[in-house]
Amino acid sequence: MSNRPRLKPLAFFLLHALAGAALAAPGAPDAPDAPAAADTPLRETAAAPVDTVFVQGQVRQVQNVTRRDLALVPPGTSPLKTLEKLPGVSFQSADALGAYEWSSHISIRGFNQNQLGFTLDGVPLGDMSYRNSNGLHISRAISSENVGSVTVSQGAGALGTASTSNLGGTVAFTTRGPANEAGVTVAQTVGSDNTYRTFARYDTGQLATGTKAYLSATRQRADKWKGDGPQSQDQLNAKIEQRLGANTLSAFFNYSTRDETDYQDLSFDAVRRLGFGFDNYAPDWNRAVNAAKGVYSGGVNNMDDAYYLGRGLRNDWLGGVAFEWNPLDNVRLATTVYGHRNHGESHWYTPYTPSSSAVPISVRAQEYGISRGGVTSDLTWELGEHTLNAGVWRENSAHSWTRSFYAVSGPESTDRFLDNPFSNPIAQRFGTTTTQFYLQDTVSALQGRLKLNYGFKNTHVTIGGANLVGGRAGGRLDADKNFLPQAGLTYALSSQDELFTSWARNMKAYQPGADGPFSQTQKAFDLSAANIRPETSSTVDIGVRARHGNYQGSIALYNADFKDRQLNVATCTGIVGCPTTLTNIGRVRTRGVEAAIDSKLASDWSWFNSFTFNDSSYRDAPVYFEGATPVDVNGRRVVDAPRVLFNTEVSWEHAGWFARVDAKYTGQRYYTYLNDSPVPSYWLSNLSAGYHLGSIGPFKGTTLQLNVTNLANKRYFGTVGTNGFVSADPSGTFATMLAGAPRQAFLSLNAKL
């Protein structure tokens, strides 16, 4: 199962090639990392230029995934998954498209998903975790066909990023704006496990009034690759833009309804007994009932090996109005007012709470609600050699969650929002107010060869929590930092080579909801509230970018010092959902090197490689206790943080034909803080190939594409930590992993009218 690569020769070649290389003519001021929304087609038919991955002129490590990359993956693939080619980025999922939210996890330089920041056209998405309390996942925020580009800052994002969780990097998604030309785009995908996806988009084109708009609809249906149950989603996206002289007024609206059936979480012990293909019992109701009574069959030996069924339901509404005002040639003010509502439920058929004396199973539902609204405003003022940026972000968010139990009499369908529970053991409600301000200056010197960027932000987050029912915590927590500085510079060593370095301090606000400090008992919360401190990080990058003819690349060294790391230690199985133990384990130290090179080998061929070595470990950690057992994690590697990542991909395009083969290596990971249960490393490869058919009857720009994922049909653990992390698991019985999808194939046809 574990295939260790021989990376040393390749890594040496890569680093040697990059040491004398890197891109850099003097760039634009160090503005927010996301590029402006672009009028880009669904598919770029020409080979992308080699300079689309590495972002020039930035004082930090910033890289870009273009529409071309997004178009080469199967339609419906999470934009997050396309980032796994970049250095420092680890993405994992149990499904081929990376869209199954329970399993979709991303980490960057050892910082996990809830320590990163995410935005869509500048609108905050929160930390995009499964039980998100202040945002939503990108797969629900926008159809993947409407994403124009994704920009990653691996170290520390721009000061203006609207996020209170970006201890590590930031990910900025930029949508495809309304097209200048009128037309209808249609795309149809069919594939493995009865997958079909239909996408249609209408663009008005630019009207005589200066107005342009688009409206798109998406429907996706598929079965799970193992077990029983559907994976379904419907989406509507719309945007309108109005030119007002030199200014632009726009409005957007996005709606998503999602129904995904869960895969069963696995342990090492379960896989040894039952195999990677084992899943929940559905549609075998009698087997689930017998297991709930302690009568096991087929290798099952405990109640938590499987349940009858699990499901996640999510409905989201995201909309807003944006105004870009350009009162002078050197002054720009961009303001966005947004609102977001979410209604969600997660269902688990639990054998721990019976519906009646005759039925030993009930549906345990966790019900989520989010209602938030906010405003972001960013000012840019160019004054000679200086570019001043200032901005403010303000958000008010209401979040609630409850745990309820619903009676069932048999295997009836529960693919809907339920009502009339027989028990409500837990209910919490939270109100969160966020205010963030930033100010920075970017100065250009030495005829533009040197660019110095410096500034700060202050962040104030107040959470008021009320425990309405049950044994969880209520109270108030404030996370305040008046001065979080950031500084960096770029220096053009030549017209082709650029040195960059940056330093930044960041803070992560406390998390309301079912995770974080409020997931403790009230007694534990009261004991910790006076001493708890928000997590903070200090990050340093230094690197070089180069561009020499058909080659471009970057190499960076980094160090991150992460203080007051809060661990939520699971104390029981996920379906029982006990209060967690919150432990401050002191400090996490991260050091590493990451490199990437993009080569245009010939007019038809290109080759991209990236390599990461990341060492993240716990430091200065006080010993904590689980019962009477002391736990010392000092020197242990951070959970779910692979030390080695490597990606390679070869692309070819000629006379309308195109193909790409990629392979990704993910190193060993851990799900225990004491590192006693390593998860094996693995290789994963994929293929994309197709032909640009051109015009066929009324259709133009027609493209036929085949995608094959997991080419070698590897068996591997795709996701680690679905049910959290534990101190130790020497017997391998803690079920917190998901098997990765086997080989799957998808065929897509898209065209424009």
What are the roles of these predicted feature ranges?
Residues 40-181, 542:
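Acidic, small-polar-rich N-terminal luminal/periplasmic segments of exported/outer-membrane proteins
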